[in-house]
Each structure stands twice: as structure tokens, then as C-alpha cells.
Amino acid sequence: MTSGVNSYASAVDDDFAKMKTLIGKWTGTLEWSTGDKPETLNLDYSVRSNGSAILEESNQGGVEMLTIFNVQNDKLQSTHYCGLKNKPVSYLISSTNGVMKFKTDIEGSGIDKSKESFVISWTIGLIEGEKDKFNYEYKVHNPDGTIVTRTAVMKRMI
């Protein structure tokens, strides 16, 4: 018999292993919920730190950013070094059928949501039977309370 903690830790490890299937270079067209002009999004995933971290290097319309995914204290987290000049730390809040949703810990990230825009959530949607495509979405919270959603279907380059 396994304890609930061990079962949860195992599920988190499974989700981290699923993320490792993204290793490689990806490209897609980022659409905006505002109707703004779409732009190219390039992602490059690599495993780092003796297998304990996944590095996502992104280039969105010429703006480079980094996100590091790792398991800490039995939680899958991401730390995003953003072009908006802040550092949202997010935690996996759900994982169902390959769709992993992360939500930013606003207070823990030191973000003042009344003064700055920041990424409030990410969704990485693995597609069953498709190793060369996945859905990518993130939402930006603005100081006025509006949320802008950006989505792309990512296709493997290498």
C-alpha cells in the first residue's frame, strides 16, 4: 500500500517525465485574444542539472525569455524569467490527459498585480498520438485587471 504523499509524488514525477518528451526545438504562430498581429514563437527545451531541470528557451517575436521547470518539495514548478522584467513562479495545479496547467503564485513571486503585467498561467497540452505537436497557452494579467490570452500550436523542428 502506498501513502497519498507517495502517490502524489509519483504523479508529479510522471508529469515531469511527460515534459521531457518536449526536448528539442519547436515553432508555432502565437495568436492573441486581442486580435493583434500574430507572431512567431520558437521554443527550445533541454534537460539540465543532472536531469533535475528542464530549460525552456523562448523567442517571441525577437524577445528572448527563459523558463525552468523542476520538481521541488513534491511539486512541479516553473520559474519564468520574463521579457516583462519580472519572475513569476508557477505551480502545476492540474494534469489531465496530457494537459498540464500551471498557475502563478503572485505573492510568492513578489509581483504587485496593481502595478505590473505578468504571466498568470500557462497550459501545455500534449496531444495523444502526436509526438511532433503540442498546444501552448499563456495568460497575461495586466494592472487594470484585464487578461490577454496567447495561444499557439507548436510543431517540432528537430
What residue ranges belong to the model's regions?
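Edge beta-strand at a domain terminus
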Residues: 94-97, 133-158
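Bacterial Sec-dependent N-terminal signal peptides
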Residues: 1-11
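N-terminal helix-cap/turn-to-beta initiation motif at the start of protein domains
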Residues: 10-25
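Buried hydrophobic residues that stabilize the cores of well-folded domains
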Residues: 27-31, 39-42, 121, 134-141
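A short hydrophobic beta-strand element
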Residues: 24-26, 100-104, 132-136
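Beta-rich strand-turn-strand
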Residues: 128-130
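Central antiparallel beta-sheet cores of small beta-barrel/beta-sandwich binding domains
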Residues: 12, 29-117
